[in-house]
Amino acid sequence: MLPEITGAHPRLFVDSKTGFLPLEDARKTVCGKALAERVVHDAEVLLKEAPAERIMQGRRLLGVSRNVLYRINTLAVAYHLTRERSFAERAAREMCVVSDFSDWNPSHFLDVAEMTLALAVGYDWLYDTLDDEQRLRIRTAIIEKGIKPSFAGRHWWITGKNNWNQVCHAGMVAGALAVAETEPELAEKTILRAIRNLPRSMKASFSPNGAYPEGPTYWGYGTEFTVVLLALLEGAFGQDFGLSEIPGFSVTGDFVIASTAPTGELFNYADCGKRLGSSFAMHWLIRRFNRPDWFSKNERNALKRETKLRPRTLKNSRNRLLPLSLLYLQDWAETASRKLVFYSGDTAEVPVAAYRTGWKSTDAYLGVKGGSPSGPHGHMDGGSFVYEANGVRWVSDLGAENYHRIESLGLTLWDARQESDRWRIFRIGPDSHSILRIDGEPQLVKGNAGIVDFQPDRCVLDLTSLYRGRAKKVTRRLELRPDQTLKITDSLSGMKPNARIRWQFCTAAEASGEKTLLLCSGGKKLAVKKNRGGKWKITPAEKLMHEFDSPNPGILIVSFDAAVPADGDLELTVEFLPENRKDR
């Protein structure tokens, strides 16, 4: 049984006694004042925008739901900052329009979850400004188009282990709390379901050391909605029922810091972008766990970029949860992190490691990826890595492909079987990743690369299961040295004589040379040396791509081939040697 929910509003994120005082407190800080000004500006722009329409993109309504969520969060926060009635009226108009949609697309339940969260916040935060007819209309939609469809049929996300679990339960709990006095039994059932099932995804997502299996971009998605759910529970009940104590969650900010390389680009494995925007989740986490060091230079600059923007139109969604950061923002003192290494832990769903030689923009960085291609948002990238030195990313990962574009062409993007179309997609399959290939074959999707030895300057991955049937043992050792050089040693045994091993990496730098490779970028140079094998081969990405692939301008796949000797064993050593390296 849950503690009783009172009939008083607001109760989402805040309580009826304290109300919106946290908004005023944040407004007294430098960063809070800047964000408040941006929110009010956007609210004024939204007064001129037409309400959302139910326009599908392929099988999704998600873009519309996200746009509505940004609009309602912005207008509701702006109303409580200014008491300007027009903001509340515009939010009510938006909510009434989407309440009249035929449905919120329950076949893709993320769409329902984000729409339900939007209306729940608006209904709760603007309750006193709505008339009885508006309240009934919005409340009915939350119940009939939001919460009840989550109990119709069997939804895999209820017990799932990825971001769908986090997002969908958060949306449903928001809706349940908003209408709790009208539907107390439905509300309690919905909230208890979330409390019971969220640990499944939290353990998979954060345990043991906070690394997110789907990469930093999806950390932003899954963690933001995990935080939404925990903040909702704390606002309504004064507790999160132990969810924030799940191992790894309290240190997950370390993962974000470690995943941001010296250039500001991410260690963008899996379906990931190049950079993170300012994060509502991070602001909550900093305050919840007293970690001002997570308000890093990158987060600080991202927030500044967001607050300086003054968009003239808001037809498409922006950083939709950022207005809620005003509940948690403080002027945290700038505290530099001094951790040069990060390890996900050997029990992590997707093992990763990150190393750096320092905290300057020119210091070296190495990100190492284990795991399985069949993992959440997985790529064929077991053993892959990214590498930076002297302010240049020399070895790249191309990150995510455009989902809608691929789906619209009829490709089976979400099928992780060995023969799936997914592995034909350049950014996702083996051709674009910095991995080993045996006889040109892809990695095995049922394989799983583990980090079997982690040290402060190096790690070893066991890649054997990715190449089962072609080798008895495959390991990769990566060492980032204090002088910024990177040494990679691949040991393969139990192979057929004369089998062809391809050693490849992805780069955006210019490349030349056959025996010793020279990479050049922005006036910087780096040599790549190997212990054996044939000449370096430099292949423009477009020669490896299909017509359905997104453009990858300037990207090269650099490789060499080596034949397996008669004894079936082979060791390959490759060194990346930046010019002007430290301690030369």
Regions found by a protein language model. Name each.
Residues 179, 218-394, 453-462, 560-569:
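Carbohydrate-active enzyme catalytic cores, enriched for enzymes
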Residues 11-18, 25-28, 32-265, 272-273, ...:
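Aromatic-lined, polymer-binding surfaces characteristic
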Residues 304-308, 405-584:
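CBM-like, beta-strand-rich accessory domains located in the C-terminal region of large
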Residues 337-426, 518-530, 573-584:
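Beta-strand-rich N-terminal accessory domains
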Residues 172, 256, 355, 490, ...:
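A residue-level signal for conserved active-site and pocket-lining positions in enzyme catalytic cores
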Residues 1-13, 20:
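N-terminal pre-domain segments of enzymes
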